[in-house]
Amino acid sequence: MTGARSLLGDIVSADLAFLVFTFGSLLVAIQVAGGQYTPRIIATTLLRDNVIRSISGLFVFTLLFANRTAGWMGENQVLQMQVFIAALFGFASLVAFLFLIDYAAKFLRPVSLVARVGEQGIAVIESVYRLPSTGVVVAPELHKERGAPDRIVCQRGKPGIVLAVNVERLVAKARRADVVIQFVPQVGDFVAVDEPLFHLYGNFGAIDENKLRTLVAFGTERTMEQDPMFAFRILVDIALKALSAAINDPTTAVLAIDQLHRLLRVVGKRSLRVEEIEDRSGRVRVILRTPNWENFVHISFREIRQYGASSIQIARRLRAAIENLIQCLPEHRHEALRVELMLIDRAIERHHPFPEDLALARIPDSQGLGGSAVSTTNNY
């Protein structure tokens, strides 16, 4: 009897200590991530990790189960099955705690964080841009003259950032009312109260404004569910923080450029023409504002070049990424990349007065510095 109570008490104490350590470490990780990487990685990566959530849930369940089992036991009664189950959960908590220490140490490394953001970005790109690029440039409905809208639906309630739009429901409503609905902001935009949310063209009286507003999700911070540009934003912010004078870690910036290069290779082969959403009959029903190829290229290279051109490592890695993209992407994607290559040449000429540094900065290197300038098949 005494031994069972002592065992349950030890399990409760151990799981309480595990919980304190876990949440304390999470707070430290949040501070480190916000200070050395970017605050935007906290909500998208750290607080959404299912492994940390599951292990924390195991600790809480084990603590409550062991404490409740101790409360059920009378003075001369031992609930052997419950004590055995509590002991199993206690052992599982110990194993999970040891695993969590190793997992957290690997998870908080820069390469792991940027790789996870890259994986999330790939998933969002594949879900938003599902069709391959055709190479045919077509003027979207968004840029065609439609005249003044027949009705403007404005934002009501609280202001916020557009997180997602239920496009399927919008198309269904537009088809039933025989109208064209233009969603004015872009996913990721901040919308203030009384700011235009929808433009309606056609039989606008058949649509309820309040039901239309419920098809848009708002929040206080951007997410990646329907916003592939946000993955680029996070990676660029990590690179910029690494290039700041306070941190001065261009190698971490190179890791971020690796993932930007990877995302651009994927998005460059996709059709970005998703402004017009058609119904089953082929008629345009919903018009959205979406990023084009130039937007993705600009966010990937402009700021990093601006703040990192003085680093030979960054200049070489940017050049390697751009030249590789020109080689592997379709012809209609090359013009924006050639402009960035020209801007890199101008920037390094301004930042590197010595001919030797200038010549070195003009050599593409996928490692930044340390990679071979020319691949050879025979090395002696």
Residue map of PLM features:
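Transmembrane alpha-helix detector for multi-pass membrane proteins
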Residues: T2-M73, L94, L98-I101, A239
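Hydrophobic alpha-helical transmembrane segments
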Residues: L8-D10, V78-G90
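N-terminal start-of-domain structural block
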Residues: L64-F65, F89-A92, T377-N379
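Short basic (Lys/Arg) and small-residue
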Residues: Q77-V83, F99-Q182, Q186-V187, E195-Y380
